[in-house]
From Swiss-Prot:
PANTHER family: NON-SPECIFIC LIPID-TRANSFER PROTEIN 2-RELATED. Disulfide bonds join C29-C76, C39-C53, C54-C100, C74-C114. Residues 1-25 form the signal peptide. The gene is WAX9A. It comes from Brassica oleracea var. italica. InterPro entries: Bifun_inhib/LTP/seed_sf, Bifunc_inhib/LTP/seed_store, Plant_nsLTP. Keywords: Disulfide bond, Lipid-binding, Signal, Transport. One of its GO terms (molecular function) is lipid binding. The lineage of its organism: Eukaryota, Viridiplantae, Streptophyta, Embryophyta, Tracheophyta. This is Non-specific lipid-transfer protein A. GO terms for biological process: lipid transport.
Length: 118
């Protein structure tokens, strides 16, 4: 019985330690990209800003609660913006948060210093 209790305590301790580590890795570039995917047509071609874009930006902003999450989101957005290359309209990309009424703590750009994002 004492062996079972020791094992249970060890498992519980591992869960407590691993829980925050797993939570910190919840925001991936896949998650970021899927939320901003509805914005790509607007960024590259213009037109009307889709409601789904604003929904995605708002959802992403609410998921990025911690500094590491916001820095990760920044890096993912920076990489995605670079991938668009010459098709990127930087002004449209940077204006999305304001147009959607979302306060984002960093500009959507290819040259944001994501390490400074808090």
């Amino acid at each position: 019985m004492a062996g079972v209790m020791k094992l249970a305590c060890l498992v519980l301790a591992c869960m407590i330690v691993a829980g925050p580590i797993t939570a910190n890795r919840a925001l991936t570039c896949g998650t970021v990209n899927s939320n901003v995917a509805p914005c790509i047509g607007y960024i590259t071609q213009g037109g009307t800003l889709p409601g789904a874009c604003c929904t995605g930006v708002s959802k992403l902003n609410s998921m990025a609660r911690t500094t590491p999450d916001r820095q990760q989101a920044c890096r993912c957005l920076e990489t995605a913006a670079r991938a668009l290359g010459p098709n990127l309209n930087a002004g449209r990309a940077a204006g999305i948060p304001k147009a959607c009424g979302v306060s984002v703590p960093f500009p959507i750009s290819t040259n944001t210093n994501c390490n400074n994002v808090k």
